[in-house]
Design a protein with these regions (language model features):
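Generic beta-strand structural signal
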Residues: 31, 92, 153-155
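Terminal beta-strand-rich extracellular "head" domains
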Residues: 78, 103-158, 162-163
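Short, structured beta-strand segments at or near domain termini in extracellular proteins/domains
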Residues: 182-194
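Cysteine-clustered segments with highest specificity for TGF-beta superfamily mature ligands
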Residues: 159-174
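Surface-exposed ligand/attachment interfaces on beta-rich extracellular proteins
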Residues: 13-16, 48-58, 67-93, 104-126, ...
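Hydrophobic residues positioned within well-ordered beta-strands of beta-sheet architectures
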Residues: 99-101, 119, 186-188
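Intrinsic low-complexity, repeat-rich intrinsically disordered segments enriched
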Residues: 1-69, 73, 100, 107
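Extended extracellular/luminal ectodomain segments enriched in beta-structured repeat modules
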Residues: 94-98
Length: 194
């Protein structure tokens, strides 16, 4: 088989015509600079790998990193909150979202309703399953004596209820609107699907 060497010059580089849409590389390929850009709806296809019976897709078609703004809200509203720190970051790999957050209150403000939620997720939670346990939380300076906190989210939302336990033998309960203070810290990391 003859070897053909193709060199592109100038600002345009190398362009393949639509009559030759496929390029096959028999060995590895190395980019010394630049990126590989995929058209929308395309990506890395892992179709040559073995699958389990429930496999629905082998195409990794999205990746991004960014920030989000976490906040605590009451299920009936809230006002007057001020945060000393309010940080959130996320990584989206396909349909999976990995989030981290840290909140430090400066002024608690007031909350109405019965329960508190962590709000502002960067993407809406997948419609199934209905209820998702997300993570345990780090916390300090609550207005009540909790020994653990966690997040419980529901389909089609961008927030999660905060729940806790006050002893190892008691049932969990959702944090109420009086359970925070001006010195409360909350932080954690969690994963969900969209």
């Amino acid at each position: 088989m003859a070897l053909t060497k193709v060199r592109g010059t100038g600002a345009e580089g190398l362009t393949l015509a639509s009559s030759a849409p496929t390029v096959t590389v028999t060995n590895s390929m190395t980019l010394t600079d630049g990126d590989i850009a995929f058209a929308s709806g395309h990506g890395l296809n892992f179709g040559s790998t073995s699958d389990v019976s429930g496999m629905a897709s082998e195409l990794l078609d999205d990746y991004e990193e960014g920030t989000w703004t976490p906040e605590i809200i009451g299920d009936g509203g809230n006002s007057g909150q001020a945060y000393q720190l309010q940080q959130g970051s996320y990584t989206k790999t396909g349909r999976q979202i990995s989030c981290m957050f840290f909140i430090r209150f400066q002024t608690e403000g007031s909350f109405s309703g019965s329960y508190l939620r962590l709000s502002g997720f960067p993407f809406t939670i997948k419609s199934q399953p209905q209820t998702v346990h997300l993570t345990a939380l780090y916390f300090t300076s609550l207005g009540d004596n909790y020994i653990s906190l966690g997040l419980q989210a529901y389909e089609g939302t961008t927030s999660a209820f905060i729940w806790g336990k006050k002893s190892a033998t008691t049932s969990r309960e959702y944090l109420g609107t009086s359970d925070l203070t001006n010195a409360t810290d909350l932080s954690g990391s969690f994963i969900y699907n969209i």
